[in-house]
Amino acid sequence: MRNKICKELNNTDIGKLVNLCGWVDRRRDHGGVIFIDLRDHSGFLQITINPDDGAALFKQAETLRNETVIMVSGIINERPKDSINTNLSTGELELKVKDLQILNQIKKNLPFPVSIHDYENTKEELRLKYRYLDLRRGKLLENLKTRHKIIKVAREFLDNFGFTEVETPLLTKSTPEGARDFLVPARLSNGEFFALPQSPQLFKQLLMVGGLDKYYQIAKCFRDEDLRADRQPEFTQLDIEMSFISEEEIISFNESLIKKIWKEVLNIKFNNAFPRMSWQEAMDNYGTDRPDTRYQMLLKDLGGILGDIGFNIFTKAIKSGGYIKSITVKGGNSSISNVRIKPGGDIFQVAKDAGAGGLAFIRVKGDELETIGAIKNNLSEEHIADILKITEAKDGDLILLGAGDKLIVNQSLDRVRQYIAKDLNLIDKSKWNFLWVTDFPMFERNEEENRYEALHHPFCSPKNIKSKDSENLKKEIESSTANAYDLVLNGLELGGGSLRIHEANLQREVLKMVGLTDKEIDEKFGFLIEALEMGAPPHGGIAFGLDRITMLIIGTDSIRETIAFPKNQQAKCLLTNAPSNVSESQLKELDIEITIDE
């Protein structure tokens, strides 16, 4: 049907007969000549139709509406100099039409304009409902092509290092991995269910047990969890696993992979190794294990200074084993008013939404500290000097303080730090601040259920374990950090991984420590334990979030802009209206009865 696409045309095509297919982007009638901007997936070309070319052809062109699908044949001409469009690669050319065929006439009014000339901000819900029209606008198509290039670069890199791409099952066993599983009823096994995988974790480990040595997969994963801008119920991982490998080797290799992607896709080269930071250092200084290091405002511990000044909130925080921490906003006295950090203010609300009761604040004015009387009246000159030294605050700076439970103080000051950095334009958006976070704890304590929870997952190998007997082994695991590592970019986790447990007794002990009985271990993970008893090699790996990598590379705030047909924030597909009801006969075949709470 066509022998060229728009972007292929250049001055060497002048005088040639070409066939093009595409959409009418817009039509203009000027002085008896019809000008049409033809759009295909690659770009635009102006086509012209003159009454002298034939009355029937001209009349047909007059009927064309935007988004009509056409095929045109004609001669490529050079545009008159006064009509050259320097914004287009084909802006010096036009097609003088000899023949026009309407392949599909537009029959419905469009829900929103597609043409770049009529572009308007359209509500995302409408864009998701008519995703095929949104794709035609071009930006989304470019995003998908960028995503394709990222995958292509990764595949070539891994192939060159001897990796084998293997597909793992999408219908698998429900195992506790943190989020809820999507369950699939098994018709041939009454009352039993498959689960869609949250990750290929166990299968890729079993591939290592099977001797594959180096594996990767562009893996679809599923988690039934509450959504936000950078989450989807189904998402894609670049999943990697290797045998006979150290933590250092995994980090070094995957850093090279990420550098390769950035070089090939963005032409950005990183000469130095990515910096590293322990989990504890990240939590102490940033309040999060995903720190954005493009700006300052580090958290500072003031518990040793303010814990005994007699201010009840501070005293209570320290006595209960909590924190008093601060962040310093440079020039904050002039940029942030009291209204914003008191109840009802936007900054106060950010802290409250993160679990804090509120924020205390100190304004530095010369050598004086201005704050509420209950704090100020109990500060000695030594207190003031120590506060200024630790916070590095100067005249005109604002010190914000959080006090209470360690987790809540870290979480609330982290959120406030991020919010203020955006609000005051403190973030250099040209920076790519990669960071490896290492030495994660093996567990975090679930006080409500009085048990441990794995911080990454219960298949991470603890560091420096020597004991073989169960009691000493448990003590060593409790005090150990994990052979785990995350790659963070500008405050977002790009990927995470670990060395895996490859000894059956150690794996069983870790699973028991997260609350599983021996019976539950055998029921849920018996196949893994058995495999580890049959000569499993030391192995480890990492999984990168492909959607998030693409999101950062194309410079958007939502991974929905990187996916052809995403779900909305209620996990619904507005295009197909999924999920949807199914017929009674389908449910009957599965022996499923639905009851809905009133």
Swiss-Prot record:
L-aspartate binds at E177, R223, H456, R500. The record marks H30 as: Important for tRNA non-discrimination. Aspartyl-tRNA synthetase with relaxed tRNA specificity since it is able to aspartylate not only its cognate tRNA(Asp) but also tRNA(Asn). Reaction proceeds in two steps: L-aspartate is first activated by ATP to form Asp-AMP and then transferred to the acceptor end of tRNA(Asp/Asn). It comes from Prochlorococcus marinus (strain MIT 9301). One of its GO terms (biological process) is aspartyl-tRNA aminoacylation. NCBIfam families: aspS_bact, PRK00476.1. CDD domains: AspRS_core, EcAspRS_like_N. This is Aspartate--tRNA(Asp/Asn) ligase.
